[in-house]
Regions:
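Cationic, low-complexity basic patches in intrinsically disordered or flexible, solvent-exposed regions
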Residues: 3
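Acidic, Ala/Val/Gly-enriched low-complexity intrinsically disordered segments
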Residues: 7-12, 24
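Asp-based, Mg2+/Mn2+-dependent phosphohydrolase catalytic module
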Residues: 13, 19, 27-36, 133-134, ...
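Active-site neighborhood of HAD-like aspartate-dependent phosphohydrolases
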Residues: 30-73
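Conserved SAM-binding loop
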Residues: 46, 124, 144, 199-200
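A metal-dependent, Asp-based hydrolase signature
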Residues: 78-115, 134
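Short, acidic loop-to-helix structural element flanking the phosphoryl-transfer center
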Residues: 114-144
């Protein structure tokens, strides 16, 4: 029996609407999204400058007679310079005026800049250059999303500026992670929907920022420390972009 063409067309249209509704149903991981953009944090993902931040903050803390350990430094990952200072002051039970805080931030940054002047291209973390090159060859857009105000200086020293289509750093954002501002701006500069972007982060606050912005996150580190990430790898050397997207299949992301 041959169906009336109008009936057939209506059936096809209704079926399409039903499938589209199911796949776009929010909150139940049904939405199938094509990944087009990759957003990377800087410290701990591209290069390990955390040690230099720690040494600079340690010097500042010593000036104020505030005990500050490497364990305390873990609390500063992924947050702004001012927020980091406030955490240190809280540890020491020290209160300062806004002007004094600004001065402390400048002193810390001056110390830090002296350290990163010694930064060498060889300090790029293992697998980073190949991962970025492969991603670009595959047609992905790439952005940096970092709280650091020294991101351009660091990338220049590492000869990685040309690896990124957009750089969002501490000079462009007002809100610290876990606020999603840095990643939302990254997606905007790449001219992509936020759902089409994956974030690479080494800090819980950064992963929360990705989630707050409606993006999936890949943790760089251990699953114990980054249990809130959709996937977790020890470094960008560990998987190719294709292998990683397969790992994220459970999150309904398609490449």
């Amino acid at each position: 029996m041959q169906l009336n063409p109008k009936v057939s067309a209506l059936f096809v249209y209704n079926s399409y609407c039903m499938i589209r509704t199911i796949m776009e149903k929010e909150g139940e991981n049904f939405r199938m999204i094509e990944v087009k953009g990759l957003l990377f944090d800087l410290d701990g993902v591209i290069v390990d400058t955390a040690k230099y931040h720690y040494l600079a903050w340690k010097e500042l803390a010593d000036m104020r007679n505030i005990p500050f350990t490497a364990e305390d430094n873990e609390r500063l990952k992924g947050v702004s310079r001012m927020k980091s200072l406030e955490i240190i002051l809280e540890i020491g039970g020290v209160k300062l005026s806004e002007g004094e805080k600004e001065q402390c931030c400048r002193i810390k940054n001056d110390i830090y800049l002296q350290y990163i002047k010694k930064l060498k291209e060889e300090e790029v973390l293992p697998g980073v250059k190949k991962f970025l090159a492969d991603a670009r060859e595959r047609g992905y857009k790439i952005a940096l999303g970092s709280a650091s105000k020294n991101a351009v200086e660091i990338l220049s020293r590492l000869k990685l500026m040309e690896a990124f289509d957009a750089i969002i750093d501490g000079t462009k954002v007002k809100k610290a992670k876990p606020d999603p501002e840095v990643f939302l701006l990254g997606a905007k500069e790449l001219e992509l929907d936020r759902e089409a972007c994956i974030v690479f982060e080494d800090a819980r606050a950064g992963i929360e920022a990705a989630h707050n912005g409606g993006m999936k996150a890949v943790g760089i580190g251990t699953k114990d420390h980054l249990s809130n990430a959709e996937a977790c790898i020890p470094g960008l050397y560990y998987m190719t972009i294709d292998e990683l997207l397969k790992e994220l299949k459970a999150s309904k992301i398609q490449s």
